[in-house]
Amino acid sequence: MLTWASQERQAQTWAIGFLDEVWWSRFALPRAHTWQSTDDPLHLVEQAWQKADPDAKALACYGVLWQRGPTDAPIRDQMSLRFVDGRPVSDITTQFLDVCCTTLQAQGKTAWLLIWDNASWHVSKRVRTWIREHNVQVKTSGKGVRILPLFLPKQSPWLNPIEPKWIHGKRCVIEPNGLLTAKQLAQRICAYFHCSYEAHLTIQENVS
């Protein structure tokens, strides 16, 4: 399916996107390496949480890495991000899928090959039902973007090419000797990935 969707004649209407979620910590320091002077070495200063801090210690984020070009030389230089007030759950997943479909429709796409892992908020009944009903609506109305989910093998997150993007991103947005607010961190992440910073998706009550 991936090879078929990557063919030039399909690229006009098909989108290929690898979806994943990640937590961005305001306090945890990533493992990083850099060239530095022996006279003035660079140190990362670990910050401590304070009770008066109104922001969350970490931000949950949904992301899609879009792929175009042939499968033997894929181009993966575009990302879509959306932060969450809370944690990834099925309700937020469907919201993010809807946002992505709206964006793809504006680009003239009619189908999305969605590649992701087997997280509970991906395989839940709520999400499977939403995708099925969404596709029926697209077929009935003749408008919108169909979603074709393709699951990665279980316990193989490294097969998702978005994973290295997260790792490098965490190294690049770190504040060496200070503490960013949640909004500052989110804005810095969006700037790094060349994405616009949008309002956070909100988790509704009593959903999972």
Please report, for each region that a protein language model flagged, where it lies by residue.
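Extended, low-complexity cationic-aromatic segments
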Residues: 1-99
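RNase H-like polynucleotidyl transferase catalytic core
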Residues: 41-52, 134-164, 177-178
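Short, basic/hydrophobic alpha-helical segments
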Residues: 91-113
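C-terminal anion-handling pockets and recognition modules
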Residues: 13-14, 146, 155, 159-208
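Acidic/histidine-rich, metal-coordinating catalytic segments
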Residues: 20, 108-123, 152, 160
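Short catalytic/ligand-binding loop motif for oxyanion handling, primarily in non-cytosolic enzymes
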Residues: 25-28, 121-125, 158-161
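Mobile genetic element proteins and their domesticated derivatives, centered on retroelements
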Residues: 20, 63, 97, 117, ...
